[in-house]
Curated annotation (Swiss-Prot):
Keywords: Ribonucleoprotein, Ribosomal protein, RNA-binding, rRNA-binding. SUPFAM superfamilies: Ribosomal protein S6. This is Small ribosomal subunit protein bS6. Belongs to the bacterial ribosomal protein bS6 family. The keyword Ribonucleoprotein applies. It comes from the Bacteria. Binds together with bS18 to 16S ribosomal RNA. Pfam families: Ribosomal_S6. PROSITE patterns: RIBOSOMAL_S6. PANTHER family: MITOCHONDRIAL 28S RIBOSOMAL PROTEIN S6, SMALL RIBOSOMAL SUBUNIT PROTEIN BS6M. GO terms for molecular function: small ribosomal subunit rRNA binding; structural constituent of ribosome. One of its GO terms (biological process) is translation.
Length: 97
């Protein structure tokens, strides 16, 4: 049975527009390549952070809603988001059935 997830991540603010699109496409691709079905992938825009993260005061928020049968896609996203210099913070939420 497919579980519903919501992922929110923040992209560093000093990124070029085309680089930002490439980051979003890359991470959407990571999810779909590992078996997830993306329902919605939307940009929330540039927002001020509640506190400073890696010397940044703001960032570009992005939200992805998806269905996944196995946690493989989520685990791979989580692993790669942690080592990406472009993503300064991310959070995965499993929605209740």
């Amino acid at each position: 049975m497919a579980r519903k997830y919501e992922i929110m991540y923040i992209i560093r603010p000093n990124i070029e527009e085309d680089e930002k699109k490439a980051v979003v496409e890359r991470f959407d691709g990571i999810l779909t390549e590992n078996g997830a079905e993306i329902i919605e992938s939307k940009e929330w825009g540039k927002r001020r952070l509640a506190y400073e993260i890696n010397d940044y005061r703001d960032g570009f928020y992005h939200i992805v809603k998806l269905n996944a049968d196995k946690a493989d896609s989520i685990n791979e996203f989580d692993r790669l988001a942690k080592i990406s210099d472009d993503i300064i913070r991310h959070m995965v939420i499993k929605e209740e059935a």
